[in-house]
Amino acid sequence: MYIKRTVEKSILEAAKSFPCIVLYGPRQVGKSTTLDYVFPANFNRVTLDDTEDRELAEKNPKLFLEVNPWPIIIDEIQKVPALLDAIKIKIDEQRKIWLKNNEERKLMYVLIGSNRFELQQGISETLAGRCGIIEMSSFTLREKKAMEAHLFTPKIEVLIQRSQQEKSEYLTRTQIFEEIYKGGMPDICTNVSERNIYYKSYVNT
C-alpha cells in the first residue's frame, strides 16, 4: 500500500521549473517508491547499484546517457560523480534546441542519492542553476496518519482554527511515545519488518 508523501508537491513543482531534479535522503525512506508513484511509466529507470550500468557510466558517461535516454530516473547517482558532467552537457545542448525552436522545456533527469555531502559538492560544482534539490526524510506523523500538511504560519487565529479542526486527531501521551519509539521508516510503518530486527540490520549495514 502506497502512503502519500508531503514531498510529492515539491517534486511536481520542481519538475515544472528545472530540467533536472535531485532527490536525496537516507537509505530506505521511500525515494524510489515515491518517484515511481509521481512519474509515469514512460520515464526510463536505472540504478547505479547495478554493476554493468555503473561500469558503463564510469567508463563512458556519454554513451551511458545515449543508451539510457531522457526522461530518466537514475538511482544512487553519487556512485558515479563523473556522470554529472555528462548530464550537464546534455542539459545545455537540449536547452539550446528548446530555445531555437521556441519550445517549452521539459524534465530530463531525476537523480536519486543517499549521500548528501557527496551529492551537494558535485551538484554545486556541476549542475548549479540546472536542477531543483529536494530532501526527503522518513514518514512524518501527518503522513502516517494521513493528515493534511499545512504550511507554517505565525497567525494565531489560523493556528487556533487548525487546532479546533484537528482535536479529534490528537494523540494521547502514550500514543506519542509509541510513535517516537516506532519511528518513521516505511518498512516498519507498513508492517513489512519488525522494528528491533529492522533497525539493528539498518545500523549494521
Stretch-by-stretch model annotation:
Residues 35-36:
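Post-Walker A alpha-helix
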Residues 43-71:
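Short glycine-rich substrate-engagement loop in P-loop NTPases that contacts/grips substrate
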Residues 84-111, 115, 124-125:
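Conserved catalytic/switch belt of AAA+ P-loop NTPases
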Residues 141-142, 146-205:
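Interdomain hinge/linker elements that couple catalytic modules in large macromolecular machines
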